[in-house]
Structure formats: C-alpha cells, structure tokens
UniProtKB/Swiss-Prot annotation:
Annotated Pfam families: Neugrin (PF06413)
Subcellular location: Mitochondrion
Record: transit peptide: 1-12
UniProt keywords, alphabetically: Mitochondrion, Transit peptide
Name of the coding gene: RRG9
Positions of disulphide bridges: none
Species in which this protein is naturally found: Candida glabrata (strain ATCC 2001 / BCRC 20586 / JCM 3761 / NBRC 0622 / NRRL Y-65 / CBS 138) (Yeast)
Transmembrane segments: none
Full protein name: Required for respiratory growth protein 9, mitochondrial
InterPro entries: NGRN/Rrg9
Length: 207
C-alpha cells in the first residue's frame, strides 16, 4: 500500500492564557466589603441629599441661574397649590409653570416673604415700568384713561400684563400694518397719463 505524505505541514501555535490566582477570581465574583459598604451608604442616603448631589453634578461649580424666573404672584400661586394639594409633585408644578423641577423645589423650600415696605417698593417699581411702557408707545398715538393705547391704522399684536401682586395693569403692544408691495407707476407713465387727461379736458371744452 502506498501512503501519501503531504508536501507542506502547517504548524499552529496555541497560546496559553496565564492562570489567574484564586483571589482575583473571587474579587470578580464576590464584591469586597468596602464596595458593599459604599453601596449601602449610597442606598441609605436621604432623598434631599440625593437631590443636592444630582444638582451639583449637573451645575458643577457654576452659580444657579435659571433661564426663566417666576413673578412674585406666580411664586405665591405655586405655594398655594402645594398647600391645597399635598400630593402634587414638583414635576407636575414645573410642567404647569414652564420651569424646571429644581426651581419649584427651591421656591417651596424658601420661606422668605416680602413685608409691607418691600411690597411698596415692588409696586413703585412696577409703576415706573408702566410709565416707561406708556412713554415708549406714546409716539404712536394717544393712551386712553384705562391704560390702552389708541392708534389709527394700527393692529394689536401682543399684550403685556404688568402685575405687582396686588395691582395689575394691562397694556396693548401695537404695531403698524405692513404696506403692500404693489408695483409703483414710473415718472414717464405718470407724465403720459397727465397729457392724456389734459387732451381729454381740452376736447371736452371745445365741444
């Protein structure tokens, strides 16, 4: 019998992974006491502290400055809603007032309320703002006794409500109508028109 011998034999080298010690394997399977204690600490942290940690992670070293701020009236209404409906959450209130839940949390946390002197200052400030708005739109027309601006050929566009918590003034912000972009008659055409009209007048007088 003839046995065929292969011309080229490929040799494969098998890499052997080093055997890891038993302690390392145990570490991967079972967490250490320190890891367990850290996890238990995290679980035992109260909700208010978790909230502070999450806010610090989001903001970092920056100062708290929300893009939208609620007025004094809106802040009071937030507090009133929370007192009336204890089960209402911060997220629900934030959706209602279009602010972040963190802003609602800070409003409910703070106990500051303005006294009579501060209320007077706020009212004066809003009065000054109202006067400024009246001056701004005084050029467009006259302002009636009820605080509304009366202007000819103008259309009401927006409404600005100025409130100090106790008094409220409403001003209509008004803008002019946009002129239509129709093609204007040229000077030559106008002259020809005038000539034709003159000729017609002359012919009418002759008759």
């Amino acid at each position: 019998m003839l046995i065929k011998v292969p011309t080229a034999v490929r040799l494969y080298s098998v890499k052997r992974t080093p055997i890891k010690p038993f302690k390392e394997v145990l570490k991967r399977i079972q967490p250490s006491n320190t890891e367990l204690s850290e996890k238990s600490k995290k679980n035992n942290i109260p909700e208010w502290k978790k909230q502070i940690i999450s806010v610090k992670k989001k903001i970092g070293n920056e100062r708290w400055s929300p893009s939208k701020r609620l007025s004094r009236e809106e802040i009071e209404s937030v507090r009133l809603l929370k007192r009336s409906f204890a089960n209402i959450t911060n997220t629900e209130l934030s959706e209602r007032f279009k602010v972040s839940p963190e802003a609602i949390r800070r409003i409910l946390k703070s106990n500051w309320e303005p006294n009579d002197e501060e209320w007077e200052k706020v009212q004066k400030r809003w009065q000054r703002r109202g006067e400024r708005i009246k001056e701004l739109y005084a050029n467009g027309g006259n302002i009636s006794s009820n605080g509304h601006q009366v202007v000819e050929n103008l259309v009401p566009h927006k409404k600005v409500i100025i409130s100090s918590g106790r008094h409220m003034n409403t001003f209509d912000v008004i803008e002019k109508k946009v002129r239509s972009t129709k093609p204007t008659i040229s000077i030559k055409d106008q002259k020809l028109k005038d000539k034709k009209l003159k000729l017609l007048e002359i012919s009418a007088t002759k008759r």
